[in-house]
Amino acid sequence: MKVTAVIGVILLIGIYYYVTLPAINIHASEFWMYLVVLVILAAVVFIRKKNLNRYDWKESKGLKVILGILAVLVIAYVAGSVLSSPIVNAKKYQELLTVKNGEFTKDIEELSFDQIPLLDKDSAELLGDRKMGSMVDMVSQFEVDELYSQINYQDQPVRVSPLKYASVIKWFTNMREGIPAYIKIDMATQNTELVKLEKGMKYTTSDHFNRNIYRHLRFKYPTYIFNDLSFEVDEEGTPYWVCPVKKYNIGLFGGVTVDRVVLCNAVTGETVDYKVKDVPQWVDRVYSADLLVQLYDYYGTLKHGYFNSVLGQKDCLATTDGYNYLAINDDVWVYTG
């Protein structure tokens, strides 16, 4: 009976990890939650094993130890969150991003009309769905993923997005061949193309079990805390997942930047781990636009401390809502007001 209980607990722990995929890293909030769940599970097992009723709880030394560990975890997490916040680290947050002033007309060269993105993401999604609807041999099995990553492909601004399985049943019937294509949209000309692959993609967000891209990455890099993944293609059209790795520069949970990048071939699942400075030239989305905007907002609003950013707001600068992209010199630039 005891062996069965132990096996059951181990299975529960394993299933919880397999489903939630927390990084084994003290900087990951999910890891702290995982530890809390483990301690609570240990308390439940201890109570059942000792057959304790609620009146015995106060007298049980073993249970007191377990609950003490739980209290330490909760207090440490709360303290770590507070001590990592901009409230007590305004200067450190303000210095996360190095900003250089420039002259727009000199720093940004004049672009030809066919290099300026005229479509936003919502418009790209409409074009992608329309293209997918015309593919009678695929439309019943696949849909277009909502990712639509903005990249610079052969000096043109394009958005790319993989197809995804229309349902779990469609995954079972098509998993052997994988996902056969991705959508590519020229953001300047509106030309929309469904690019078919010689071999299907077998590591995607819509795959299940060990072929799910998040699970695949977690088992290969158990300690890495990944930022939002983006879908890109190299200059030959090979599909990849670009997986930025977060670095926490302030306390346990604050001051997020990007330290490394993992590239995962969406067809084979092969991965390569790079430092940011060594990332291949074709990769465009090491830093997400949201992260860059957040870092600039820290720089612009925290010059005179946190409370000034909330109350007096002297000398505070913040970005306007929304942003867009420019493709310049094989790079993607984010611009906003």
Feature names for model-found ranges:
Residues 2-337:
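Soluble extracytoplasmic regions of secretory-pathway and membrane proteins
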